[in-house]
Every structure is written in structure tokens, then in C-alpha cells.
Amino acid sequence: MVLIKEYRVCMPLTVEEYKIGQLYMIARHSLEQSEEGEGVEVVENKPCEDPVHGKGQYTEKHIHLSSRLPYWIQAICPRVFYVIEKSWNYYPYTLTEYTCSFIPKLNVLIKTKYEDNNGSTENCLDLTEDELKVRTVDHLDIAFDEVSAKHYKKEEDPKFFKSEKTNRGPLIEGWRETDKPIMCSYKVVHASFEVWGLQTKVEDFIQRGIREILLLGHRQAFAWVDEWHGMTLEDVRAYERQKQAETNEKIHNTSGGANAAANAKEANDGDID
């Protein structure tokens, strides 16, 4: 059975504001989290169009993360290991898929929709009756849910952060019921790993990892609001291109990174359609 979790993450922003903040946060976060030989490599970033959702942006990334995996996963993975992320951004709706050429049974699908409310829509992404029966909902609080110690920075803690540009924050207990403006990211995550003996363990690991990333990323988007607020879409796309170039250079800055790039290309040529 595919594990289905719906994460609802409220932000003291409007949906239109978050369109800029999200792009800024992802670009900066990817650079900060990347190291020599490991991190998020942007392979493709181009406009796309869908008959239902209209014009959007397609992005493909290779996430090199061998040393960041738990030992029990490293034991079954090759030395050079990467996950393929494909994302179709038709804001305020996005679709993101994660696969791995080495582990064909692994698949993660994330459907996202953004609304100007505090997480009160009960079936925002139009799940079927069968999906609703197995769905669990997790309301993430960017101020009072804790991130791991290795990711915590006081200056990025919404309980202490005060925006000079927007005069928003610090966030107090119950802020999701009282603060305006407010918006919510609704994310439905389908995670499946159909390997007997490891399925439950891997699917739980994936969901925990996604929850941590969502919590950290949304905290940072708010904590960095004074840096991106007022940017146009053209401004943030230019920033995105700059940071993507810096991130790719950082990943491939050593011989190990170069080998990872070569091996990634070889794997991609051989295993991915």
C-alpha cells in the first residue's frame, strides 16, 4: 500500500508573495545545503505548458546525497548515488516526482496547491474516496514545531524573527488563528518503495525527511522575507539562475564532484528514458 500523507504548512504571507519567496528560498537553500561533490545539481530549467494548468516552469535536478543517507541505506547503494527530481510548477499548483535509476521500485509523488487560508480546506487536492481513507494529515507549525539541531538557527526562528519590510513576526502561540495575511501550502505525498523487508522502513524514512525539509524550507522563506520581498518574478528568476550556477560549480568543485557528474551522466544515458 502506498503511504499517503498530506502536509499543511501555513505562512504569514499571501499566495502571491510566496510565489516569489518560494523561488528565492529554494535557490538559496540548495546552495547552502550543497557541498563539494554532493548537493542539488540543476540539469534543466525551462518554460512548459499544460492543457489544464496553463503555462509553467519545468525543472529537473539531480540530488547527490550518498553520505547523507542512513548507514542501512548506504549499504545497498552504489558509491555515487543520486535522486532525480522532476518538477512542473504551474503556480499555485505544482507536481513533483522523485525517482532513482538504481532503485526502480522507489517513487515519490508530491502534489501541491497554495491557498489564501489557514489550512481549513479538507480536500484541497481532490483526492478520491479511497485515497482519503488512507490519508493522514499533518499540520506543520513553522514557529512551534522543532527542526533538527543541525538545522536550527535562531535568526531563522519565527518565534524570534521580526520583518522590517513587512512588520510581520515574531509568531506567537496560536498565530495561525489570528495573523493576517495567511496562506497554506497543501502537499499530498505518495511514497512507495516496493521491496519486501524494507518497504515500511524506507517509506517512513522518506516521509520524515520530507517533513523536515518542508518545515525548514518554509521557516527560511519567512526568515528571509526582507531579502526577497519586493522582487519581481524576473528579479527572482535572475537570482535563481545565479544561485543554480554557483550550486552546480560547488558540487563539481573537486575531482570527486567531477567523477560524480560523469557517473551521473553515464547512469542517466543508460537508465533514464
Curated annotation (Swiss-Prot):
Question: Can you say what this protein is called?
Answer: Cytoplasmic phosphatidylinositol transfer protein 1
Q: What does this protein do?
A: Phosphatidylinositol transfer proteins mediate the monomeric transport of lipids by shielding a lipid from the aqueous environment and binding the lipid in a hydrophobic cavity.
Keyword entries, A-Z? Lipid transport, Lipid-binding, Transport
Q: Where is the segment annotated Disordered? A: 244-273
Q: Name one GO molecular function term.
A: phosphatidylinositol binding
Q: What is the lineage of its organism?
A: Eukaryota, Metazoa, Ecdysozoa, Arthropoda, Hexapoda
A biological process from GO: signal transduction
| Gene giving rise to this polypeptide | rdgBbeta
For this chain, the family text in UniProt reads: Belongs to the PtdIns transfer protein family. PI transfer class IIB subfamily.
Q: GO CC terms on record?
A: cytoplasm
Q: Which InterPro entries match?
A: PI_transfer (IPR001666), PI_transfer_N (IPR055261), START-like_dom_sf (IPR023393)
